[in-house]
Amino acid sequence: MFLQLRAEVEDALADALTTLDLPAEDLGIEEPPEDVDAVLASSVAFRLAGEVGTAPPNVASDIADAIAADDLTYVSDVTTQGPYVNFLPSEAYFAETLQSVTESGFGRLPDRDTSVVVEHTSANPTGPVHVGRARNPIIGDAVARVLDYAGYDVDRHYYVNDAGRQIAVFTWAYETFDEDDLPEPERESPEYEMVRYYRKGNTILEDGDPDEVEAAEAEVQSILQGLEDGDEETYERVAEVVDTVLGGMQNTLGRLPAEFDEFVKETKFMRNGDTDDLVDRLKGLDCAVYEEDAWQLDLPDFEKNLVFLRSDGTSLYTTRDLAHHEWKFDTYDRAVTVLGEDHKLQADQLAAALELLDNDTDQLRQVFYSWVNLPEGGMSTREGTGIDLDDLLDEAIDRAREEVESRLDDRTRGDLDEDDIDRIARQVGIGAVRYDIVSKQPTKGITFEWDRALDFEAQSAPYVQYVHARCCGILGDVETDIPDEPDLDPLSEPEERDLLRELARFPAVIEAAADDLTPHTVATYTRDLAETFNAFYRECPVLDADPETRAARLALVDGTRTTIANALDALGVEAPTSM
């Protein structure tokens, strides 16, 4: 109901300003501080005071007097507090909120008939997913989920670098070395088995005999040239390596979970001629220059030129990515790319080049993120191999299992078997990792800390998940169904009304997170909702209340369960039914 109330306030405020012959372009609507009883407030009096020639509180009073609250559905009264115009909620606002929050799809917005492609992760298929890159799939998947909740038609893409030097080295190494000469894989999974070839190949290229290195480099260059020339046999050789490694990486990413609708390969835009066509168009631009044995764009706003073609006629990653983006613009209404902060220059140059090629770059938005660090000694890892995402997730599950088992009382333990405990440990452990990462502003660097991520008493995934499990436990103890139209009248306690207000905000939180591409604000909302529910739970007995109050409070519990489940789902975090 929050969105409906906001729309009603916008219309009423605009009409009042028009009546007073005042401009209504900027209404200054905002959520007031917690100690103000209003749901929404307007600071428009600040803006208009100079034009009217009187103090802001006087302007606010005139505006409030021009609004007939009796004609509104979701607003009961319009008051002022200094320069602010406050809009108080009506009983209809609370009643319709109580009814809507128990619907399973609460928080999902109407279809916008707008297609969006979200490209994220796109790590080179050269081995296991490293923990340092874990923020990309977590943020990217959450952005896609929030957009989906907001009514967009979303596709999730992984852009596969299958045409660069690293892949050519990998292909040469895979075809050259005997598996018997390689160390045992760290895990029985395709990417762990294949990366052994890649590591040995790089060792040879860095430290090998000069003649051996020269022969290897010639083969690597031959593979790159074969891709550029459209040689089908070369494509097949490369695809065998890429697809095998990518299959294993998918399994790891699926644990988060981060799933994809399509894996779009760079070579697609070489094979279909798009890259060659793009190169011809780039050469025709006024800022195109041939310098230092390469074709480049001398972009006026950048100190560094954008190289798009080497002297030997081979294209670069950025060249193929330009063709990739033009394909996205032709296929989708909007395109979102999630990138590490070290790619910002490349992304800005790409956008500038796309604009020079007459593309509408308003279709394109980027989400940049900083890195995830682990505290010294924070992980047990294999010597010399670094920390892979699988390592982090395994340890998260192990630590979560210890925490869950330590919190089980005799009654709960008797209700759960080992499979249940394994399930809860996975939900809590992986949820803790994902939530801890997605809950931070992407541009801020973070250090992942186990104690914080798995703290059941603090602002963490387990804290929010536990509220969902508690709601499920309460509802599991009753045999009657929640009424389709629960009665609001018994809900008069401040904690009950506070909980209704918080629940009502969820659709607006989704809308804002989708507009701004900020899923971390949904995580903030889940913590606020969990805290508000806990205050309600402490002060308002549910099962021991009189029948009418019990039924109404059960509806509140059911609404909280639904809202937390959907909010966590929008973040890609599971909501356990027991913990």
Curated annotation (Swiss-Prot):
The keyword Zinc-finger is annotated on this UniProt entry: no
Localization: Cytoplasm
Keywords of the record: Aminoacyl-tRNA synthetase, ATP-binding, Cytoplasm, Ligase, Nucleotide-binding, Protein biosynthesis
Keyword Glycoprotein: no
'HIGH' region (motif): residue ranges: 123-133
Record EC number: 6.1.1.19
Protein name: Arginine--tRNA ligase
